[in-house]
């Protein structure tokens, strides 16, 4: 009986490990950490990580979105962030999804006053292409009310993740993992990184999705 119990526990451990591994394969989790106490190293080449590539959802150049749980004035901040990205990248347009359309980028606000001011969950298919993302934002985090400028800044950052970018290793980028509110603009580096992430559509102008396996980061 003792050996049987140990065997059952071992099988349970293997099952949990297997399920956890599957989750890591299916979902790419990005957590935005609010911090102003650390500074990325300036002793390395400036670069932005290229995380993911959109698949067939981007074939027409349009990504649909839906904003949930947002007050009207807060929703305007998110719309402004989406519009800003659209103005700064060629070949991608955002469209609010109607009730009959699938949502490519779901944007929701959490109200738990937790320790995450922004988070993007990217779901990929079996071929490794993005098929939808879920952006989580907050009005309050770390016991503090975030002002409108900060909420819009974080929205821009998370939308960058939704488009396929990882983090930048330098503070002058809106994709920096740390908060530098003075760097609130999209530069050529972010534009080029988005294009490289979705090269099949934005550079090659192809109708067939293809992963850009040769690019894991872009030097700025």
Model-derived regions: residue spans:
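N-terminal Lys/Arg-rich, disordered targeting/topogenic segments
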Residues: 1-7
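Disordered inhibitory propeptide/activation segment of secreted metzincin zinc metalloprotease zymogens
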Residues: 5, 12-74, 82, 121-126, ...
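Metalloprotease/metallohydrolase-associated module, dominated by Zn2+-dependent proteases
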Residues: 21-31, 125-150, 166-220
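Divalent metal-coordination and catalytic microenvironments
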Residues: 65, 85, 157-160, 175, ...
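Metzincin-family zinc-dependent endopeptidase catalytic domain
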Residues: 75-169
């Amino acid at each position: 009986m003792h050996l049987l119990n140990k065997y059952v526990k071992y099988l349970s451990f293997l099952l949990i490990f297997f399920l956890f591994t599957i989750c890591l394969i299916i979902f790419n989790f990005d957590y935005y950490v609010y911090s102003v106490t650390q500074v990325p190293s300036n002793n390395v080449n400036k670069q932005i990580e290229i995380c993911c590539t959109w698949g067939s959802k981007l074939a027409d150049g349009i990504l649909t979105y839906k904003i949930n749980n947002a007050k009207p004035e807060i929703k305007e901040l998110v719309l402004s962030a989406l519009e800003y990205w659209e103005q700064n990248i060629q070949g991608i347009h955002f469209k609010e999804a109607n009730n009959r359309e699938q949502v490519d980028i779901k944007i929701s606000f959490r109200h738990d006053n937790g320790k995450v001011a922004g988070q993007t969950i990217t779901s990929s298919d079996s071929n490794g292409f993005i098929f939808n993302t879920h952006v989580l934002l907050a009005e309050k985090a770390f016991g503090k009310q975030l002002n409108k400028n900060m909420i819009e800044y974080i929205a821009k950052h998370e939308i960058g993740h939704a488009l396929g970018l990882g983090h930048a290793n330098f503070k002058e980028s809106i994709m920096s993992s740390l908060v530098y509110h003075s760097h609130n603009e999209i530069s050529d580096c972010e534009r080029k990184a988005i294009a490289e992430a979705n090269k099949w559509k934005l550079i090659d102008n192809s109708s067939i999705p293809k992963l850009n396996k040769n690019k894991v980061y872009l030097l700025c």
